[in-house]
UniProtKB/Swiss-Prot annotation:
<dbReference type="InterPro" id="IPR046928">
    <property type="entry name" value="SDO1/SBDS_C"/>
</dbReference>
<dbReference type="GO" id="GO:0042256">
    <property type="term" value="P:cytosolic ribosome assembly"/>
</dbReference>
<dbReference type="InterPro" id="IPR018978">
    <property type="entry name" value="SDO1/SBDS_central"/>
</dbReference>
<protein>
    <recommendedName>
        <fullName>Ribosome maturation protein SDO1 homolog</fullName>
    </recommendedName>
</protein>
<dbReference type="InterPro" id="IPR002140">
    <property type="entry name" value="Sdo1/SBDS"/>
</dbReference>
<dbReference type="InterPro" id="IPR039100">
    <property type="entry name" value="Sdo1/SBDS-like"/>
</dbReference>
<dbReference type="InterPro" id="IPR037188">
    <property type="entry name" value="Sdo1/SBDS_central_sf"/>
</dbReference>
<dbReference type="InterPro" id="IPR036786">
    <property type="entry name" value="Ribosome_mat_SBDS_N_sf"/>
</dbReference>
<dbReference type="InterPro" id="IPR019783">
    <property type="entry name" value="SDO1/SBDS_N"/>
</dbReference>
<dbReference type="InterPro" id="IPR035647">
    <property type="entry name" value="EFG_III/V"/>
</dbReference>
<comment type="similarity">
    <text>Belongs to the SDO1/SBDS family.</text>
</comment>
<dbReference type="Pfam" id="PF20268">
    <property type="entry name" value="SBDS_C"/>
</dbReference>
<dbReference type="InterPro" id="IPR018023">
    <property type="entry name" value="Ribosome_mat_SBDS_CS"/>
</dbReference>
<dbReference type="Pfam" id="PF09377">
    <property type="entry name" value="SBDS_domain_II"/>
</dbReference>
<dbReference type="Pfam" id="PF01172">
    <property type="entry name" value="SBDS_N"/>
</dbReference>
Length: 234
């Protein structure tokens, strides 16, 4: 449970009345992004208020009338998702910077410059975000807003969502370490063992992650892995 001194007010006007709960601002953000959260950790008090600052609680009858339930967790979910979370200016700056970094990283990994078929460096994406004056919603997930952001950036920065399908062959002496590393990396769609003990797989990854994959193969297969780009999808 978040402490009262770290909690902020989430407020919803419904049925002509205002209802408030005291919440952890970061868990409230996670809930708005569509993530599951523990409501015992989210709420500073398992109460629904008419005025949290005055400690004025909403009555059970009123909650049932307006929300159709007196379950505090269910009501808190509705207040957070449908209402407004009153975060501080410092919290907003912190959340905005974190979200900006997530968006830059996502765009760098999942898009390419169609002129070069290579990903844009994060610094270039960051400059384009500033130049385009893109609005970033701290309460939306990256996935929910990145397509609109990329659309806004395209007049400034050529971008294209693209994936690659890559065939990889690992020599027998490196399979133990390489296989687990590639599965942890993600994107293995097919695999096959060869009679000589080597291992072949096909991976599908965002094109922006190709460099990371090559770096990984260099480490786990000592530069002895064979790779071939089968196709680009996008």
């Amino acid at each position: 449970m978040v402490s009262l001194d770290k909690a902020v007010i989430a407020r919803l006007r419904k049925g002509g009345e205002e209802f408030e709960v005291l919440v952890d601002p970061y868990l409230a953000r996670d809930l708005k992004e569509g993530k599951e959260v523990n409501f015992e950790d989210l709420l500073a008090a398992e109460e629904v208020f008419k005025d949290a600052k005055k400690g004025e609680r909403a009555s059970v009858d009123e909650l049932r009338k307006i929300f159709g339930t007196d379950d505090v967790f269910e009501i808190a979910r509705k207040i957070i998702l449908e209402g407004e979370v009153q975060i501080t200016a410092e919290q907003r700056r912190e959340m905005l910077e974190a979200k900006r970094k997530q968006i830059i990283n996502f765009i760098s990994r999942n898009t390419i410059d169609p002129r070069t078929n290579a990903p844009h460096p994060p610094s270039r994406i960051e400059r384009a975000l500033e130049e385009a004056k893109v609005h970033i919603d701290i309460f939306k997930s990256v996935e929910a807003q990145v397509k609109d952001i990329v659309k806004a950036l395209k007049p400034i920065l050529p971008l294209k969502f693209e994936e690659m399908e890559i065939a990889i062959k690992i020599p027998p002496e490196h399979t133990g370490r390489a296989i687990s590393a590639l599965y942890n990396f993600g994107g293995v769609t097919r695999e096959e063992w060869q009679r000589d003990g080597s291992w072949i797989c096909v991976m599908r990854i965002p094109s922006g992650m190709y460099g990371d994959l090559m770096d990984l193969l260099g480490k786990v297969a000592k530069g002895e892995a064979l790779t071939k780009v089968l196709r680009r999808i996008g």
